C-alpha cells in the first residue's frame, strides 16, 4: 500500500514556521479569456521551515488577484494546525480534510492545502538528498514540454504569428491553445490556423 512510511527513508521533519509571500508578475502576453483579460499573474510563494533546518518551497498560481488574500489566510490557518508536528504528507492531508469538513473541501481551501502539500514534499526530498521523482519511486529524466504562454482567445488574424513566436521562444515542438470562442466553427478555424 501507498504509505508515507513506506516511501520515506529519511529523517522526520517537524514544522517550525511557514512564510508566505505574494507577487504579481507582469505578463509578456496578456491573457484574453472568457473570464476577462489579465495583464499580471498573481503568485503565492510558500516556504515551510522545519526544526531540522530544511526548507520546503512551493508556489501557487491562483489566476485571480482577488482570491490571493483568502488563499493566504487559508494556508496560514492550515499551517498553524501542524506547527510543532511531524510533516508526513498523507497525515497532513487526512487531518486537513477532517478539519475542513465544515467549511468545505474544495476551492480556496483545497488550493491552500495543495501549496502546503507541495512544500512538504519538497522538504522531504531535500532532507533525503534525492530528486522528488526518485523519492516517489520514479526516475528523473527529460519530459516533452510545450509553450503555454499565449494563444488565448485573440482575434484569428493574430494566431499564426503568435504560434510561430511561441515555438521559437524555447525551441518548443508544441504549444497550448485555448478554445471557447463564440462558435465551434471559430474554434475549428483557430485550430487550423495554428496547425499551419
Give each language-model segment a name.
Residues 8-52, 57, 61-63:
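Structured beta-strand/loop patches that form or line metal/cofactor-binding pockets in enzymes
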Residues 141-196:
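Metal-dependent enolase-superfamily TIM-barrel catalytic cores that perform enediolate-based chemistry
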Residues 6-7, 24, 37, 70-73, ...:
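N-terminal accessory beta-strand-rich subdomains and adjacent acidic, glycine-rich linkers
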Residues 117-153:
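Glycine-rich, aromatic-flanked loop segments that form ligand/cofactor-binding clefts
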Residues 38, 136-138, 167:
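Short glycine/proline-enriched loop/turn "hinge" motifs that connect secondary-structure elements
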Residues 12, 17, 49-127:
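Metal- or metallocofactor-binding catalytic centers and their adjacent structured scaffolds
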Residues 41, 66-69, 73, 87, ...:
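Conserved active-site and cofactor/substrate-binding residues in soluble primary-metabolism enzymes
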Amino acid at each position: 500500500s501507498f504509505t508515507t512510511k513506506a516511501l520515506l527513508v529519511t529523517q522526520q521533519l517537524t514544522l517550525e514556521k511557514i512564510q508566505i509571500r505574494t507577487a504579481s508578475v507582469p505578463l509578456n502576453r496578456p491573457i484574453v479569456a472568457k473570464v476577462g483579460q489579465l495583464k499580471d499573474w498573481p503568485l503565492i510563494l510558500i516556504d515551510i521551515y522545519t526544526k531540522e533546518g530544511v526548507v520546503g518551497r512551493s508556489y501557487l498560481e491562483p489566476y485571480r488577484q482577488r482570491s490571493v488574500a483568502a488563499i493566504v489566510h487559508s494556508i496560514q490557518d492550515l499551517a498553524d494546525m501542524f506547527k510543532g508536528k511531524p510533516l508526513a504528507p498523507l497525515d497532513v492531508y487526512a487531518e486537513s480534510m477532517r478539519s475542513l469538513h465544515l467549511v468545505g473541501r474544495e476551492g480556496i481551501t483545497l488550493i491552500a492545502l495543495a501549496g502546503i502539500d507541495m512544500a512538504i514534499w519538497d522538504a522531504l526530498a531535500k532532507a533525503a538528498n534525492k530528486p522528488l521523482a526518485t523519492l516517489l519511486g520514479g526516475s528523473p529524466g527529460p519530459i516533452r514540454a510545450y509553450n503555454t504562454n499565449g494563444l488565448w482567445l485573440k482575434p484569428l488574424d493574430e494566431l499564426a504569428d503568435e504560434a510561430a513566436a511561441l515555438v521559437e521562444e524555447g525551441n518548443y515542438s508544441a504549444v497550448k491553445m485555448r478554445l471557447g470562442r463564440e462558435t465551434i466553427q471559430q474554434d475549428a478555424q483557430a485550430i487550423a490556423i495554428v496547425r499551419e
